[in-house]
């Protein structure tokens, strides 16, 4: 049916307020889009203040890298050896009273004999070669722990090496220094020695060195490292490798024994004449071959001889230190020394 003539559907008029509202909404949407877009160009400085940085306007500043603290190498030094008194305890099994006396006697350290030139061992060694030669007191182990456990006391274990009548006679084939007849050699004092070239000698003494290091001693001082110099020396059956090479190989074996204890120093005691003359052919000692193998060289001397001895050692062992053994405190006592008698 057709609509009424002259009439159409009335839709009303569009108010101007609605148009304005639509425009505002469009502007808000555009503003939001622009805000979101430029967010990617907002940067913040070190203080947290925002800045607008458009593409191509300037090179983006690199963030400052945090300061890196320079690596510092920490070195822990053991107490300096500036005066060590040898007490009577050094030639006998250590007791608790001896240890306490040593700690209060002054100086910075103590030298304790753990094996003497008669072959006696003054601690409970696990080495089977020492089993018949051990001499201790009930409190020796505790006394040794007292010394090595003191942070203010530099401890040196003194070991007599090749002059050892007990071990030499107990195992002539494995360790003893023989005469040309195949029997144990007796020197001018009717004493017996170990052969430094024999593996049994190196194993035994190397084991003692390792045990002393494991007990906490800061340094191992080897004494009586030489061939005999008294008696019928022409009757000695010297090692085929030669005397000097045998001594050198022995010291290298002792150094190897300390491989697990890199902070423990290895030292040797030499006669003053070996340092001043450079060698002793009779004893098989050559300073230039010995000095590079040890950290310190001890020698009995007087204060006036120290400068010349230091120069001689330094000339053949750049890092080797001379430790003079004195009977009185020197006038210049800022250098290391060993006091062998109470002043």
Task: Identify the role of each PLM range.
Residues 87, 154-163, 221-222, 243-284, ...:
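Aromatic-lined carbohydrate-recognition surfaces of secreted/lumenal glycan-active proteins
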Residues 76-89, 162-210:
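Active-site-adjacent "subsite" loops/lids of carbohydrate-active enzymes
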């Amino acid at each position: 049916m057709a609509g009424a003539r002259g009439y159409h559907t009335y839709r009303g008029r569009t108010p101007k307020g609605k148009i304005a509202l639509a425009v505002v909404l469009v502007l808000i949407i555009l503003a939001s889009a622009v805000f979101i877009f430029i967010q990617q160009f907002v940067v913040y400085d070190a203080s947290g203040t925002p800045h607008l940085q458009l593409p191509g306007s300037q090179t983006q500043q690199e963030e400052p890298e945090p300061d890196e603290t320079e690596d510092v190498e920490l070195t822990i030094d053991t107490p300096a050896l500036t005066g060590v008194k040898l007490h009577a305890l050094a030639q006998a099994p250590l007791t608790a009273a001896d240890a306490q006396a040593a700690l209060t006697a002054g100086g910075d350290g103590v030298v304790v004999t753990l094996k003497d030139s008669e072959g006696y061992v003054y601690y409970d060694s696990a080495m089977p070669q020492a089993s018949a030669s051990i001499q201790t007191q009930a409190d020796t182990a505790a006394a040794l722990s007292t010394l090595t456990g003191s942070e203010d006391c530099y401890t040196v274990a003194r070991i007599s090496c090749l002059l050892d009548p007990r071990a030499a006679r107990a195992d002539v084939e494995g360790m003893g220094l023989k005469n040309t007849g195949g029997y144990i050699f007796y020197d001018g004092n009717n004493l017996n020695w170990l052969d430094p070239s024999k593996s049994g000698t190196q194993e035994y003494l190397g084991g003692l060195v390792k045990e002393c290091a494991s007990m906490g001693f800061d340094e191992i001082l080897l004494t009586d490292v030489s061939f005999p110099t008294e008696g019928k020396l022409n009757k000695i059956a010297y090692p085929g490798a030669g005397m000097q090479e045998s001594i050198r190989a022995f010291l290298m074996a002792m150094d190897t024994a300390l491989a697990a204890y890199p902070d423990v120093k290895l030292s040797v005691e030499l006669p003053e004449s070996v340092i001043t003359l450079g060698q002793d052919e009779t004893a098989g000692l050559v300073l230039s071959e010995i000095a590079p193998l040890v950290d310190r060289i001890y020698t009995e001397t007087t204060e006036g001889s120290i400068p010349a001895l230091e120069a001689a050692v330094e000339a053949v062992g750049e890092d080797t230190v001379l430790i003079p053994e004195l009977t009185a405190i020197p006038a210049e006592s800022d250098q290391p020394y060993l006091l062998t008698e109470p002043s």
